[in-house]
């Protein structure tokens, strides 16, 4: 059966993404000084105000107010008429240390307690919380990501680029994109059905002018030729006007764009957000590891599509469960594939941190346009360095 599937993205000026970037900018500043910092920072942004709250345990000192203001200004909220201005907005902070009850399990995992510290080094740090995390990959795009979320991100990035480079000078920072793709009976993308762009703009711009310039400077340069058609339904600012935007129009919160951050709704999500969390939080690090495994499995040709779920208990280093699904696309025995994954990939938090080199100030740039499918050497979970090892396990 043919079906339509839709995914969305948002620009860096979207209120929730402003909050995510502030939280991750604070994390980067702390982890740059203290790689072992324990950080869980949440941000709220609204008209003229940014509120930062959370738990931090560290020897580092950072100027949170300065980080907040610089992040807002870098995004593009530089003028009071936007309703939110990094120079003049209020900044309120409420930061305290990590709960000692949580620290008991993170600082010394259950496995280390049971072995009286004589065990494996990677058994020493426990998961910072319970929960389940998902990783996914598909061979339908070069990014090993679903086509709808890839195109939605590319449109959002292009929308921001033409604003910042003043190619379209009347755009403002807030914006959203959405792409609907038709899939064939065998799950292959066939064509783009609908493209939706909502772009904040200056008040003197007409809707027809906006449609014309976005088609010329954003949509056509972004959509691959193989998917372009004059039959694509294109919607631009369907309400007819988008002048009021950003935090002055909608309150933004850290962690409210978890589907944008991951796979565009193509697979389940455990619910845990990424931004503002140091890598001992498996909400972040285990998601990255799961993506790493999934991408390498598909790139190795072991399946056309692959999903992995991993679950944790707070204070315990080793996952409590691991499940895989190839959606009937596996080229090898699935039970053996699961065994090989367990043998080759270590999902304990400290092992993930070491493997992916996560104790670095790399997180602010993950906080907009998706954590996965990005061509950036700092996104170590996108590496394909396990492909050959996986192939050898199956004598390929």
UniProtKB/Swiss-Prot annotation:
Its EC number is 2.5.1.6. ATP binds at residues 14, 174-176, 241-242, 250, 256-257, 273, 277. PROSITE patterns: ADOMET_SYNTHASE_1 (PS00376), ADOMET_SYNTHASE_2 (PS00377). Its main location: cytoplasm. Keywords: ATP-binding, Cytoplasm, Magnesium, Metal-binding, Nucleotide-binding, One-carbon metabolism, Potassium, Transferase. Mg(2+) binds at residue 16. It catalyses: L-methionine + ATP + H2O = S-adenosyl-L-methionine + phosphate + diphosphate. It is found in: Cytoplasm. It comes from the Bacteria. K(+) binds at residue 42. L-methionine binds at residues 55, 98, 250, 281. InterPro entries: ADOMET_SYNTHASE_CS, S-AdoMet_synt_C, S-AdoMet_synt_central, S-AdoMet_synt_N, S-AdoMet_synthetase, S-AdoMet_synthetase_sfam. GO terms for biological process: one-carbon metabolic process; S-adenosylmethionine biosynthetic process. Binds 2 divalent ions per subunit. Binds 1 potassium ion per subunit. Pfam families: S-AdoMet_synt_C, S-AdoMet_synt_M, S-AdoMet_synt_N. GO terms for cellular component: cytoplasm. Catalyzes the formation of S-adenosylmethionine (AdoMet) from methionine and ATP. The overall synthetic reaction is composed of two sequential steps, AdoMet formation and the subsequent tripolyphosphate hydrolysis which occurs prior to release of AdoMet from the enzyme. Belongs to the AdoMet synthase family. Homotetramer; dimer of dimers. This is S-adenosylmethionine synthase.
């Amino acid at each position: 059966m043919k079906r339509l599937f839709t995914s969305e993205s948002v620009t860096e000026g979207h209120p929730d993404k402003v909050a995510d970037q502030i939280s991750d900018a604070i994390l980067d500043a702390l982890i740059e000084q203290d790689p072992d910092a324990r950080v869980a920072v949440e941000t709220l942004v609204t008209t003229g105000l940014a509120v930062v709250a959370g738990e931090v345990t560290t020897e580092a000192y950072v100027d949170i107010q300065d980080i907040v203001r610089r992040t807002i200004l870098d995004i593009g909220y530089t003028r009071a008429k936007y309703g939110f201005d990094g120079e003049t907005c209020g900044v309120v902070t409420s930061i305290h240390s990590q709960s000692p009850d949580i620290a008991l399990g993170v600082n010394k995992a259950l496995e280390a307690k049971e072995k009286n510290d004589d065990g494996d080094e990677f058994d020493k740090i426990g998961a910072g919380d319970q929960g389940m995390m998902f990783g996914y990959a598909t061979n339908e795009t070069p990014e090993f990501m679903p086509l709808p979320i890839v195109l939605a991100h590319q449109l959002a990035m292009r929308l921001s680029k033409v604003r910042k480079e003043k190619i379209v000078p009347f755009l403002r920072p807030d914006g959203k994109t959405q792409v609907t793709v038709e899939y064939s009976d065998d799950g292959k993308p066939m064509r783009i059905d609908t493209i939706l762009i909502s772009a904040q703009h200056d008040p003197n711009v007409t809707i027809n002018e906006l449609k014309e310039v976005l088609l010329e400077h954003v949509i056509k340069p972004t959509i691959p030729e193989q998917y372009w058609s004059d039959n694509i339904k294109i919607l631009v600012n369907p309400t007819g006007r988008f002048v009021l935007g950003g935090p002055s129009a909608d309150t933004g919160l850290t962690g409210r764009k978890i589907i944008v951050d991951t796979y565009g709704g193509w697979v389940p999500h455990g619910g845990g957000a990424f931004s503002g969390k140091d890598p001992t939080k498996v909400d972040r690090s285990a998601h990255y590891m799961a993506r790493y495994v999934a991408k390498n499995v598909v790139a190795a040709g072991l399946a056309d599509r692959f999903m992995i779920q991993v679950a944790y208990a707070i204070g315990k280093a080793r996952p409590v469960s691991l499940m895989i699904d190839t959606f009937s696309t596996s080229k090898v025995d699935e039970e053996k594939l699961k065994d090989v994954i367990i043998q080759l990939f270590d999902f304990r938090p400290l092992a993930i941190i070491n493997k992916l080199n996560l104790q670095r100030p790399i997180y602010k740039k993950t906080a907009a346009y998706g954590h996965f499918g990005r061509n950036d050497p700092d996104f170590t979970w996108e590496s394909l360095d396990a492909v050959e090892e996986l192939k050898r396990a199956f004598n390929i």
